[in-house]
A protein has these predicted regions:
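Catalytic cores of NTP-dependent nucleotidyl/adenyl transfer enzymes across multiple folds
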Residues: 1-59, 64-70, 74, 78-87, ...
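Acidic, glycine-rich loop-and-beta core segments that form the ion-binding/anion-interacting portion
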Residues: 92
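Charged, long alpha-helical assembly modules
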Residues: 112-113
Length: 114
């Protein structure tokens, strides 16, 4: 049972990444990908819900969009790197890590264009 709509939850998770220091940033970055991947209604529903936050004028959205742009739009940026490191640990190199990083970049671009 969801406790929060997907759009506001994504804004919160992205902004948590922006404001944190240390190891928890990797979890926040991975949570963004996990939320989009695991939605029962499909990833499109989560992206659409994030787009609604733009129309609803969510006060946290400006920081979230800037964070996505600055940290998630390329596989070599901090967000995807930390997500891969969090999820894969010492195995954060190779094909699995690259795939995870690229998936997160795809999600970031979809959210930015929602």
């Amino acid at each position: 049972m969801p406790f929060c709509h997907y759009g506001p939850l994504l804004v919160l998770k992205i902004n948590a990444f922006a404001k944190r220091e240390g190891a928890k940033r990797g979890k926040d970055a991975y949570d963004i990908l996990s939320l989009v991947r695991s939605c029962a209604e499909g990833p499109e529903a989560v992206v659409a819900a994030f787009g609604e936050e733009k129309r609803e004028d969510n006060s946290g959205l400006e920081m979230a969009l800037r964070t996505l742009e600055d940290h998630f739009t390329d596989a070599d940026r901090l967000g995807p790197a930390l997500a891969a490191s969090f999820y894969l640990g010492s195995r954060a190199q190779g094909d699995s890590a690259l795939r995870l990083r690229e998936d997160l970049v795809t999600v970031a671009h979809a959210l930015l264009n929602a």
